[in-house]
Amino acid sequence: MKEYRVYLERARSRQQDFLYPLIFREYIYGLAYSHNFNKSIFVENGGYDNKYSLLNVKRLITRMYQQNHLIISANDSNKNPFLGYNNNFYSQIISEGFAIVVEIPFFLQLSSSLEEAEIIKSYKNLRSIHSVFPFLEDKFTYLNYVSDIRIPYPIHLEILVQILRYWVKDVPFFHLLRVFLYHFCNWNCFIPTKKSISTFSKSNPRLFLFLYNFYVCEYESIFLFLRNKSYHLRLKSFSVFFERIFFYAKREHLVEVFSKDFSYTLPFFKDPNIHYVRYQGKCILASKNVPFLMNKWKYYFIHLWQCFFDVWSQPRTININQLSEHSFQLLGYFSNVRLNRSVVRSQMLENTFLIEIVSKKLDIIVPIIPLIRSLAKAKFCNVLGHPISKPVWADSSDFDIIERFLRICRNLSHYYNGSSKKKSLYRIKYILRLSCIKTLACKHKSTVRAFLKRSGSEELLEEFFTEEEEILSLIFPRDSFTLHRFHRNRIWYLDILFSNDLVNDE
């Protein structure tokens, strides 16, 4: 956070609160590189980090200074107008720079707002993607209906830029952003396709996520406003609302429209038990009351996306299901509400009664089939789940190979320790353990049995199963019953900020 303050103060000293001069500063790209280098990863994946150098950045900035966008000759028709030629590497560097620069003022506003609200200490826990599961455990057992909604895209580029302009008041910066997106990312078509969106999100992930999150934040602000207006009990949210141009004018317009055109239908939206959860590109809407209200909110979402954001969404893609009969996928987990039935014997005077008690419990399990599919894609096993060797890593030392497998196993165990049933997690550990042994045997050109007998690596490879117990023994008392109880129960780690690379949430 202090780094952002320093860089913004440098820009303010040269220009009056403008962000665009930071695009031409070398330290911005160095900051983007350090963020990518220090990011927590689960599977090693070489990117442009290995190609980064200060010399490449200097050449890039020089070309950006010298480029004249008003003069494009016929000989340059096959070249990129932004830099003179097509180069995905330079595109990724520039997009990282744009993302870093535009994030600076929001980090400063967010930090100041958190300091005023005095929630700095708990902010890291609130940032955890697993902080949503304790909320679901408390609330969803009392609800009856759920709707799993995929937030639609693509959205036109101009709408994304206009939404961002409500927050950042810097016209030259947005001119540069438009030039980059239109010419370098080939977003000059009238209606962008899903293929172009997918290509842009993979080659420029940080900038794409930043723009996409602003689109989601905009529609959620309208949804929250209408939700508060639909019931007399106002919701209190810890979210930070930043200053935006025309926001209050838009609110007044919405109030006027709803008071005139929807004065009779608005009372039907009064549902105090509706809950909304968003994760990645999906959201979950759950309610305790009849599905009629859920159906109302479904069509509200569809009309909101179509009328305000020009995004087409089909009503049949949003299904309303009974929570006790439907399982939904959330952050790599399968979740549903399970009914537990128990019989209690009650005696009154000389009469004995059998009373059946039904209780609800949120069941969260590891989806073994999608996870095995992800492991097979990463070449740790085949499609049937049989472990195979990893010949690509055979050039590394034995210690590095074991450490790589242990890191992946540790991260998966850390991520899926909130599962209700640990059997699937043990199977994943078993696949990684045998894949590690086969990789070491392949390196030494030996069979698995001969390698284990010769090297005696069984004790070292036991770390795949014993490490989690050692961590729990440091947290809880060294009582076998206590450790066994916590080993069976769910434990949510609130230091997880990113989704695991092997998690398939499709």
Curated annotation (Swiss-Prot):
Usually encoded in the trnK tRNA gene intron. Probably assists in splicing its own and other chloroplast group II introns. It comes from Trifolium microcephalum (Small-head clover). GO terms for cellular component: chloroplast. GO terms for biological process: mRNA processing; RNA splicing; tRNA processing. It is found in: Plastid, Chloroplast. It holds the Pfam family MatK_N. HAMAP family: MatK (MF_01390). Keywords: Chloroplast, mRNA processing, Plastid, RNA-binding, tRNA processing. GO terms for molecular function: RNA binding. Belongs to the intron maturase 2 family. MatK subfamily. This is Maturase K. InterPro entries: Domain_X, Maturase_MatK, Maturase_MatK_N.
